[in-house]
């Protein structure tokens, strides 16, 4: 092939790939248009097709305007801003034949917009989704925050691996009754529970789980991704059945506890380590903290104080559980 022909062919391929990537189907009759978001951007040319065997007397309208926008089985529009998005409908003789909804995914300075969810500032990386697992069963919960109250829709998909995805099923997204306050502003918390179908608790993980949240606010589309191994998101439930046993002729007591009911078994294989801490009046913490691998410890327990215990995977530095506590009095 002549070099000039090769360059022309390559350029044509790039144009084709670009046009394929800038509009794609999110779900049936819902399309996402990817736009460079700056004043001089030309926008994207979108061709809508009326899904009908009819050929003649077809007209088009949109939710933004009751005027007839065009006629024929296809409608070509230029999408540059949110006013160009929305629902487009084709009709014949007053009868609706099909509808197409256009959403916009903004890219500013090469970065996709993240306006819908609240960034959770708990690490050097930008985190919008947080996921936790109580054990190694393959079941985990993810959540996110938003200040938006209306015209909001979420959907979640998940898999382990990319080239050969394994089945991870996620349930319906639910709005939590919990309200989270950050920087003097209230945020709504949404959660979803997922389960890996073929999880083997004792197997070594070689491929990460990926969770993708599709978020829609009015006509704006965004997606958020979290990738992790189950071992990295483990956070046990707090220890249970805390009890104090006074020791004769001593200021010390023996505090005992049990593994949380939700933790993986057998405990001889899925072992936890525990930290014990005395906490004084008004929740004033003492700096000393005793960490043990067994389910009891001897500590000083002053009147009006309390003893609290937390747990973590013994062999992997994942998250500590929340505290469980028992009163000294």
UniProtKB/Swiss-Prot annotation:
Domain Fibronectin type-III residue range list: 238-329
CDD domains linked to this entry: FN3
MF terms in GO: cytokine activity; cytokine receptor activity; interleukin-12 alpha subunit binding; interleukin-12 receptor binding
Gene Ontology annotations for the cellular component aspect, listed alphabetically: interleukin-12 complex; membrane
Domain of life according to the entry: Eukaryota
GO process terms (BP): interleukin-12-mediated signaling pathway; natural killer cell activation; positive regulation of activated T cell proliferation; T-helper cell differentiation
Domain Ig-like C2-type: 29-106
Signal sequence bounds: 1-22
Family annotation (Pfam families): IL12p40_C
Disulfide bridge map: 50-90
Chief location: secreted
Residues carrying sugar: 135, 223
Location in or out of the cell: Secreted
Keywords annotated in UniProt: Cytokine, Disulfide bond, Glycoprotein, Immunoglobulin domain, Secreted, Signal
Cited function: Cytokine that can act as a growth factor for activated T and NK cells, enhance the lytic activity of NK/lymphokine-activated killer cells, and stimulate the production of IFN-gamma by resting PBMC. Associates with IL23A to form the IL-23 interleukin, a heterodimeric cytokine which functions in innate and adaptive immunity. IL-23 may constitute with IL-17 an acute response to infection in peripheral tissues. IL-23 binds to a heterodimeric receptor complex composed of IL12RB1 and IL23R, activates the Jak-Stat signaling cascade, stimulates memory rather than naive T-cells and promotes production of pro-inflammatory cytokines. IL-23 induces autoimmune inflammation and thus may be responsible for autoimmune inflammatory diseases and may be important for tumorigenesis.
Similarity remark: Belongs to the IL-12B family.
Subunit structure: Heterodimer with IL12A; disulfide-linked. The heterodimer is known as interleukin IL-12. Heterodimer with IL23A; disulfide-linked. The heterodimer is known as interleukin IL-23. Also secreted as a monomer. Interacts with NBR1; this interaction promotes IL-12 secretion.
Name assigned to this protein: Interleukin-12 subunit beta
């Amino acid at each position: 092939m002549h070099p000039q022909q090769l360059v022309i062919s390559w350029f044509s391929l790039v144009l084709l790939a670009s046009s394929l990537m800038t509009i794609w189907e999110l779900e049936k009759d819902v399309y996402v248009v990817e736009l460079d978001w700056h004043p001089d951007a030309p926008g994207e040319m979108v061709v809508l097709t009326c899904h009908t065997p009819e050929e003649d007397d077809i007209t088009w309208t949109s939710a933004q305007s009751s005027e007839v926008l065009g006629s024929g089985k296809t409608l070509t529009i230029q999408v540059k801003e949110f006013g160009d998005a929305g629902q487009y409908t084709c009709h014949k003789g007053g009868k609706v034949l099909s509808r197409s909804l256009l959403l916009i995914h903004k890219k500013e300075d090469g970065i996709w917009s993240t306006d819908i969810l609240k960034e959770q500032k708990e690490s050097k990386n930008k985190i919008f989704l947080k996921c936790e697992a109580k054990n190694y069963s393959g079941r985990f919960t993810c959540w996110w925050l938003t200040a938006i109250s209306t015209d909001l829709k979420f959907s979640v998909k998940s898999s382990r691996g990319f080239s050969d995805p394994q089945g991870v099923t996620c349930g319906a997204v639910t709005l939590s009754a919990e309200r989270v306050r950050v920087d003097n502003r209230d945020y709504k918390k949404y959660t979803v529970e997922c389960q890996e179908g073929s999880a083997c608790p004792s197997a070594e993980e070689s491929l990460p789980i990926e969770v993708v949240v599709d978020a829609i606010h009015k006509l704006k589309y965004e997606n958020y991704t979290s990738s992790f191994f189950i071992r990295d998101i483990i956070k046990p439930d707090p220890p249970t059945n805390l009890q104090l046993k006074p020791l004769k002729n001593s200021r010390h007591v023996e505090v005992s506890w049990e593994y949380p009911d939700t933790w993986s078994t057998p405990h001889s294989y899925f072992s936890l380590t525990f930290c014990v801490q005395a906490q004084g009046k008004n929740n004033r913490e003492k700096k000393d903290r005793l960490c043990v691998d067994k389910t009891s410890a001897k500590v000083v327990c002053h009147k009006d104080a309390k003893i609290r215990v937390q747990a973590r995977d013994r062999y992997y530095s994942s998250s500590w559980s929340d505290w469980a506590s028992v009163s000294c009095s």
